Amino acid sequence: MATTKIILKKSVNNLGHAGDIVEVKAGYARNYLIPQGYAFPWTKGAAAQAEAMKRARLAKAIATREGAVEAKQIIEGTAVEIFAKVSESGKLFGGISNEQIANALAEKVAVDPKGITVEKIQTLGEFPATVALHPEISANFFVKVVAE
């Protein structure tokens, strides 16, 4: 398969951060990353622009690192309760989304739903979850699903 170099405009999970030069399959770049505004094609001139983006991202990361440490202290080890409709057998109607978890966490700290990692929740119970607050800092917490 053919690959192509691109420069990321925004952070993409499991791929890289803004300003990173990555090599991906041509179809992924052409059909998804570039049209959705996540990336642009790599050129020699664009490589300099990528370096500027990377420097700006690093400066912002240093400023937000302190905030991420404070947020981790608040979130780490806590549990958030989410109320959901369930069938008589205890199975959820639908599932629990990252947006619902982020909204429940918003009472304590505002987080990006894209940074939340949790297994697929289909039943009542308590589930471990992780939220990325910063590229180097993440916090572990629990999602407790309770019947309405």
Curated annotation (Swiss-Prot):
GO biological process entries: translation
Membrane-spanning intervals of the chain: none
Keywords: Ribonucleoprotein, Ribosomal protein, RNA-binding, rRNA-binding
GO molecular function: rRNA binding; structural constituent of ribosome
GO CC, alphabetical: ribonucleoprotein complex; ribosome
Keyword Nuclease applies: no
InterPro entries cross-referenced by the UniProt entry: Ribosomal_bL9, Ribosomal_bL9/RNase_H1_N, Ribosomal_bL9_bac/chp, Ribosomal_bL9_C, Ribosomal_bL9_C_sf, Ribosomal_bL9_N, Ribosomal_bL9_N_sf
PANTHER family (alphabetical): 50S RIBOSOMAL PROTEIN L9
Family recorded in the similarity comment: Belongs to the bacterial ribosomal protein bL9 family.
Role played: Binds to the 23S rRNA.
The name this protein goes by in its record: Large ribosomal subunit protein bL9
Species name: Bifidobacterium animalis subsp. lactis (strain AD011)
Gene for this chain: rplI
